[in-house]
């Protein structure tokens, strides 16, 4: 039986909504959702910037460690990416500091498992590998951009960063991904309200010569700033989506479908 035109339009509308939703895990839970988290409307950027407020680490864009050996905002060469094994998997060794509790370790490793099954990325406990991520609890949530070489720290502060969405965000930085709103084509999708931004923090909104991997701008990306990042005052948005200013940005739960697609494209996952 043929579907009525109105029914077809409804199905297309629902499909469009579904494409913007965060990814769900195999148990049917929303990836990155924190059980019992009462502050459900705080976006990832706000949590990260709040946690990083007192850090003495030199950071770019709020949570990227400023490197000394390359252009911070350029991670296109193969030396910046983690190597793929002959079996097609990108194995990234890690160690987790003993200062974390068992529950905190479970949260960190649960965020790492969000990459399994949907990408070729595999975070594995380090044995004796030279390149590895060291997860530590310093003052703030931050990461290197891409593979640094040797030991590289990824800070997940026990007090302010212990959320799966934040951990996935920082792991994406470690894979080589930048913030969504710094894309070279961002001016077609968001308006930066410079007058509402703390002057000393305005550099965090500079555009970069990014490799967009032939993917569309993603308002729902876990790598997108919230609308009031680095704002001078409550209610003074620093970022406004265009043409529809009501489009949600700065979600807090987990990787979007385009986040996952980009990992698969960048690392040539099969």
Swiss-Prot record:
Protein name as annotated: High choriolytic enzyme 1
Subcellular location: Zymogen granule
EC number: 3.4.24.67
Keyword Nucleus: no
A GO CC term attached to the entry: zymogen granule
Cofactor(s) annotated in UniProt: Zn(2+)
Sugar-bearing residue positions: 53
Entry's Gene Ontology molecular function annotations: metalloendopeptidase activity; zinc ion binding
Cysteine-cysteine disulfides: 75-80, 120-269, 141-161
Cofactor note as given: Binds 1 zinc ion per subunit.
Taxonomic source organism: Oryzias latipes (Japanese rice fish)
Gene that encodes it: hcea
Name of a matching Pfam family: Astacin
Signal peptide: 1-20
């Amino acid at each position: 039986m043929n579907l009525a035109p109105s029914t077809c339009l409804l199905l297309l509308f629902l499909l469009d909504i579904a494409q913007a939703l965060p990814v769900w895990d195999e148990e049917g839970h929303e990836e990155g959702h924190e059980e019992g988290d009462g502050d459900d409307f705080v976006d990832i950027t706000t949590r990260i910037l709040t946690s990083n407020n007192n850090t003495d680490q030199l950071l770019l864009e709020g949570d990227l460690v400023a490197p000394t050996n390359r252009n911070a905002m350029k991670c296109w060469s193969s030396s910046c990416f983690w190597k793929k094994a002959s079996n097609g998997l990108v194995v990234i060794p890690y160690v987790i500091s003993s200062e974390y509790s068992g529950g905190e370790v479970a949260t960190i490793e649960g965020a790492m498992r969000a990459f399994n099954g949907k990408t070729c990325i595999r975070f594995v406990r380090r044995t004796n590998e030279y390149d590895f991520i060291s997860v530590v609890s310093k003052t703030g949530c931050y990461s290197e951009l891409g593979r640094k070489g040797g030991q590289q720290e990824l800070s997940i502060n026990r007090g302010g960063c212990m959320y799966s969405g934040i951990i996935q965000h920082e792991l994406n930085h470690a894979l080589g991904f930048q913030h969504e709103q710094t894309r070279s084509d961002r001016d077609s999708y968001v308006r930066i309200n410079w007058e509402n931004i703390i002057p000393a923090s305005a550099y965090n909104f500079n555009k970069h010569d990014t490799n967009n991997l032939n993917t569309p701008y993603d308002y729902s990306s876990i790598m997108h700033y919230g609308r009031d990042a680095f704002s001078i005052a409550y209610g003074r948005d620093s970022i406004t989506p265009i043409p529809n200013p009501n489009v949600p940005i700065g979600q807090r739960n987990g990787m979007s479908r385009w986040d996952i697609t980009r990992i698969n494209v960048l690392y040539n996952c099969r």
